[in-house]
């Protein structure tokens, strides 16, 4: 028994005998000598090869060269090269795993490497200083593995193009330092651990092997496998080095400071070092070990800081954002997809959640195609009660099922207005609509579109349903429509924008005008169903009653005809012939929804004697349930007005205005010029816009003349930036409101585009059917091109922002527009030298508080900014001291005066359209010149590119209300008396002329700070708001109403001078199809009026009655007639214009 035990111990000692220093040096030197000698040999061969190549180039031909170029040797050499090339190609196919054999080879190498590493782990249980005998069974297995590695190393060496680069690769170094010691162990009949721990670096091939095996397919799994392989290979390799040096000790101390440490303890030490947490139970004692720990700690800080948090984030995001949304019964939610970024989400949430917390009962599910960034994730956490983020794509039905889009109230698709390729952005969003509609055809879609011509694809989707709430928000159409309205009526762009912008930021105004402007910014467009007690009353009667009793400004209604095929739509300021029906929807300008509730609660019985708006609440009166037709509407109105008159006797409220018969006759006579011209104008088949035959680009392209600049006057100059490769911004959307049919042909202003001819040529195919459009090749950055367009006499100069460019800075996106504004703003114009001021001059030269006029004025300008934060550049150019010190565009002085516009607020329309799509319809009606969703479908068909085919179509399209900017003294508003307050003016203009006053355009009162007499916008002033003589009034004017007054002192000599100037202008532009605007005698004898169109419809039988009355009263009018000469001259000019128009009754395209 004792002998057996002794024999076993002697056998173990034979297997684990001590390794001498010479044996360890032999193992290490075999690796280093192989590496160094191989590298030296490769360098020598490369040096010799380069020397031979260089010598061949210098010598040209020689004995050796001729020897190599002889016939037989050359053929053998070419054959050898061919064989070598094919052999290398085969090896490369194997090593790249492109074939099945190659995949098996790569996988086998990885598996054998892991097997060799496992053998190292087994052998590491023995002391490092011991050598295993060749009787150890793991040594032959490891020898076989390394023999295969040698074969694989040779294949890789032959396939490498750069041998030296291959020799220095990490996998090559691993093979060089692990394969030679194996063969040395076979020779010495003993094995030593040595540097075999380097085999752990083969773990870096793990992601590639898993991809070959199709084990991982997603990007997250590939990223995770890569991070895991890096961490494990680093840990195992570093632990092997610590295990070697700590068990061997420092060589110069001959191992006296060594310690017995296992490989597991080394791994533990490395992990503790990587996490920068050391407990001190396992430490390095050797100098080599401590030096290695110092450098490894620095590397581990980078590794731990970069890779470990990313791994944690991968696990967290996978669990957090790949789940499904649980749609609970009775819980409302919407799905938002598309451009999910920090800016878009912030803008959407700010507008969608701007209601009170108790009123928000809709959850928002964001469907993003990529995991949210840390900043976006923070936003979602701030709105955790309302938002949920799901990672997925609207293109995949699986992801749509995960967000339960079929149960959602609506699906909102966000676009990126600052993208470099707007067409691609639109197409991707349209594809999302197709995917959602194919998945569930009943899902309501609200989509943002950047370019207007891409809208046509959406109504063609079979399941698209306007009646179900599907809606399109077109940025180009609305943005350019706003700018066009600012050209027609100065300040109107700011007026309309302020109604759709809600400011939550508190600002303390320093001046009186700032206080008025900021208070007016509180107003919004709100809708409310009208009380049934208004049924049977006319719109002016209801608007007056709401204004006086409820302090509400009613501007429009949703009219539904009682006939089956009658009109149904929105009407701005309907005429008195339109009667209010039950359940009519009204549009108000008010501050809060609570205020407009009064229009629903109003009761003619309970609230007849109530004159405090806050007391008009829901009365619950039984009479409200009865049908209102039992009481005539006239009696109700008389009763209400009687109560109002008795109440206003002791208060400052505006009294009812009465007009004398002479004034009414004067007003009726003024409507005549419009009706005479209706039938002579050429319109499109819808009757909404002025139309003409297609005009070639050459006929409207203006040439630079050295003698005289083009005789434009009171025209619109549009500065456009772009080239042949720029994306189209859709100038048709800018032109259409300026060519609305509720202007006569003489009232149309010439439009001159200044820009690159290559760009405008691409836009011209959408503009060629509109009259009086001209193109001046050039650039708005050069004053010479501006003077060529006679910018001194223009009514408005518009600077449109250039199309977005790839990888452009958000700050520099408006650089060209800002520089153009600087150039235009530097132009000083002497207004005293003009014989007859233009429209813009009339506004800019209005008298101030001291009845003085400025002799020098600047060109009226309206600039578009894509980036609202660039407003501080425009503020510096404003020339107005003491301005609002704000970086917010909508709180800036430039915005308050109507000189700047940005479409950034259009993002809020997405939430507005979801809550109340009627508001979006009203906005489209106001800014587009009357384009509706139904009309858009027809405009894209060739058959409507012609003239109106009937008088009915023409009248139904033209008789739309339009907005204007009227003076208190030079227009028919001077007939309103008294007009000391806004309430008095509102009631008087509505009673006398049917004109609806909605706001003011007032001169900034501080003269020393406002040398240019700039005006600011006041939206919906209070009823008691005091008026100033210099105020201009924003009004909704009926189409048939002429707002100018006759100039009694107009001389015939002045008429002759203007006619002469007009004829010269016509001769100057004889080479174009449509000459610039020519002012006839009748036009110049009236004060100009700003006006703009908006889509309304009314009962047109009243207009025919009015025209009959005009013809009857024209013979007995008391107005002083113009001289016979003036009448003849005016008729002559009208005839000339008709003769020169070559596009009368054009054919369809």
Swiss-Prot record:
Domain notes: The S4 segment, which is characterized by a series of positively charged amino acids at every third position, is part of the voltage-sensor. The pore-forming domain (also referred as P region) is imbedded into the membrane, and forms the selectivity filter of the pore. It contains the signature sequence of potassium channels that displays selectivity to potassium.
Family the UniProt entry places it in: Belongs to the potassium channel family. Calcium-activated (TC 1.A.1.3) subfamily. KCa5.1/KCNU1 sub-subfamily.
Keyword list, A-Z: Cell membrane, Cell projection, Cilium, Flagellum, Ion channel, Ion transport, Membrane, Potassium, Potassium channel, Potassium transport, Transmembrane, Transmembrane helix, Transport, Voltage-gated channel
GO MF terms, alphabetically ordered: potassium channel activity
Localization per Swiss-Prot or TrEMBL: Cell membrane; Cell projection, Cilium, Flagellum membrane
A single GO cellular-component term on record: sperm flagellum
Transmembrane parts of this sequence: 25-45, 102-122, 139-159, 164-184, 189-209, 227-247, 292-312
Reactions mediated catalytically: K(+)(in) = K(+)(out)
Record function comment: Testis-specific potassium channel activated by both intracellular pH and membrane voltage that mediates export of K(+). Represents the primary spermatozoan K(+) current. The channel underlies a pH-triggered membrane hyperpolarization during the process of sperm capacitation, as sperm encounter the alkaline environment near the ovum in the female reproductive tract, thereby playing an essential for male fertility.
Bias kind Low complexity: ranges: 829-845
Residues in compartment: Cytoplasmic: 46-101, 160-163, 210-226, 313-1149
Segments of skewed composition (Polar residues): 1106-1120
Residue ranges that the UniProt entry lists as topological domain Extracellular: 1-24, 123-138, 185-188, 248-259, 283-291
Intramembrane stretches: 260-282
Topological type in the membrane: Multi-pass membrane protein
GO biological process, one term: fertilization
Source species taxonomy: Eukaryota, Metazoa, Chordata, Craniata, Vertebrata
Disulfide bonds: none
Motif Selectivity for potassium mapped to chain: 276-279
Domain RCK N-terminal: 331-473, 713-884
UniProt name for this protein: Potassium channel subfamily U member 1
Region: Disordered, residue numbers: 829-851, 1106-1149
Activity regulation, per record: Regulated by changes in cytosolic pH; activated by alkalization. VU0546110 acts as a selective inhibitor. The auxiliary subunit LRRC52 shifts the activation of KCNU1 to more negative potentials at a given pH.
Domain of life where this protein originates: Eukaryota
Tissue expression summary: Testis-specific.
